[in-house]
Swiss-Prot record:
Protein's name in the database: Anti-adapter protein IraM
Subcellular location(s) per record: Cytoplasm
Superkingdom of this protein's organism: Bacteria
NCBIfam families documented for this protein: PRK09919.1 (NF007393)
Disulfide feature: none
Keywords assigned by UniProt, alphabetized: Cytoplasm, Stress response
One GO CC term on file: cytoplasm
Keyword hit for Cytoplasm: yes
Function: Involved in the stabilization of the sigma stress factor RpoS.
Single biological process term from Gene Ontology: cellular response to starvation
Keyword Phosphoprotein: no
Family classification: Belongs to the IraM/RssC family.
Length: 120
C-alpha cells in the first residue's frame, strides 16, 4: 500500500522520528521509527519486509510503533521535540542544548555545542 508523508518530527532526546502518513483510503497513521532515516513531508512511501521505499529508493527502517493519528498527540510531539530542524524557517546551525541522539542530522545542521568539554 502506498502512503504519503504529511509531516515528520524528529526527537533529538530519543533519536526517534515520528511521521504522520496518509493512505489513498483516507487512513491516517503515526509512524514511530529510528531517526537514521528521514521521511520528508510529501514523500511517497511503500512498506517492504526489509525496509521502506521512500520515493522509489529502499531504506532499512526500524519501526517502533504505528498508531492511529491523534491530533492532540501530534501537537504535543511537535511542541516537545525541541529539534531546531523541525522549525520553519530552518536555522543554519543546530542550537539543541543537549546531546542529540540522532546519529546524522537529517537537516544537515552542524553543531557547535560542548557538553562536559566534549563537542556534541
Amino acid at each position: 500500500m502506498e502512503w504519503k508523508v504529511v509531516d515528520t518530527v524528529i526527537s533529538p532526546s530519543t533519536g526517534v522520528s515520528f511521521s504522520c502518513i496518509h493512505s489513498l483510503k483516507n487512513l491516517r497513521l503515526t509512524l514511530w521509527y529510528q531517526a537514521d532515516v528521514y521521511m520528508p513531508p510529501g514523500s511517497i512511501i511503500i512498506p517492504f519486509n526489509k525496509g521502506v521505499l521512500i520515493n522509489d529508493k529502499l531504506y532499512p527502517v526500524t519501526v517502533y510503533n504505528v498508531t492511529r493519528f491523534n491530533p492532540v498527540l501530534w501537537k504535543s510531539l511537535k511542541e516537545n521535540s525541541h529539534c531546531p530542524g523541525n522549525c520553519n524557517p530552518k536555522p543554519e546551525a543546530c542550537s539543541y542544548p543537549f546531546e542529540c541522539l540522532v546519529s546524522v542530522c537529517p537537516f544537515g545542521l552542524t553543531r557547535n555545542i560542548q557538553i562536559d568539554n566534549k563537542k556534541v
